[in-house]
Amino acid sequence: VTACLTLSPWAVEFAYFAGFSGAGMALLTPNSGSPPAAFFLNHGAIILTASALVYGRIANLRRGAVWRAYASLLLYMALIGFFDWKYHVNYSFLCEKPASTSLLTFLGPWPYYLVGAGVVGLALFWLLSLPVGPRIPANKLKPSLYPAQNVHRLLADQ
């Protein structure tokens, strides 16, 4: 939400890398405890939003975005871990693996799967950075048939 409202480079980078990879993994291995419609709508919306921001050229990723987003994710997970410990919950499966089969099933027992998940996350961030290479400045683009590119051009000119 912050990325959409502010177009802050940091928020867009975090939404793209952490949101896309986290929601993507969740969609591939859904948790049986959540209502299916809400689960798929929420996680799908994260991916669609991140895709629209980055691939629609509404916002660009900066050099070093992978590392900034990864460091932000580690800090966020540390805060979530403290919250989990204090309130005896298991948000983001930091305290124990989900009951259903997921990628975490193959990464070893707790707490070792957390390290494996961190490595997999960094690899996913790197893979997500591949299709988002250097961008052409908006004022150098020719008029486009794609509305998102025209919107980006209008926003850049203001």
Model-derived features: positions:
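Membrane-interface helix caps and helix-loop-helix hairpins in membrane proteins
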Residues: 6-10, 29-38
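Cytoplasmic-side transmembrane-helix entry/capping segments in multi-pass membrane proteins
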Residues: 12-20, 39-41
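Aromatic-anchored segments of alpha-helical transmembrane domains
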Residues: 19-29, 73-83
